[in-house]
Swiss-Prot record:
This protein's UniProt keywords: Ribonucleoprotein, Ribosomal protein, RNA-binding, rRNA-binding
Organism: Nautilia profundicola (strain ATCC BAA-1463 / DSM 18972 / AmH)
Keyword rRNA-binding assigned: yes
Protein name in the entry: Small ribosomal subunit protein bS20
Function: Binds directly to 16S ribosomal RNA.
HAMAP family named among the record's database cross-references: Ribosomal_bS20 (MF_00500)
GO MF term list: small ribosomal subunit rRNA binding; structural constituent of ribosome
Length: 90
């Protein structure tokens, strides 16, 4: 266990950051799974709506500094390719 004040503060900060990171990691996974499950069902409308919601969330995470810009855009792009793969041809 740490003995000096600065080490104790670092431990407190690490706990707080770990909790926050865990929260956002699970949110990202949940958002992604929502799109993937709609694609797996073959429901284009639901998949598109889920993708729009994911896009909005990821853009917010970019603005808050939770996700790096390229990481979020890569995730959005991959999800969009999934949704487009089940798009009904007109």
């Amino acid at each position: 266990m740490a003995n000096n004040k600065s080490a104790l503060k670092r431990i407190r900060q690490t706990k707080k950051r770990t909790e926050r990171n865990r929260y956002f990691r699970t949110r990202i996974k949940t958002i992604t799974k929502k799109v993937e499950s709609a694609v797996a069902e073959g429901n284009y409308e639901a998949a598109l709506e889920a993708w729009k919601e994911a896009n909005k969330k990821f853009q917010g995470y970019i603005n808050k500094g939770i996700l790096k810009k390229n990481t979020a855009r890569r995730k959005i792009s991959r999800l969009h390719h999934l949704v487009k793969s089940i798009e009904p041809s007109a």
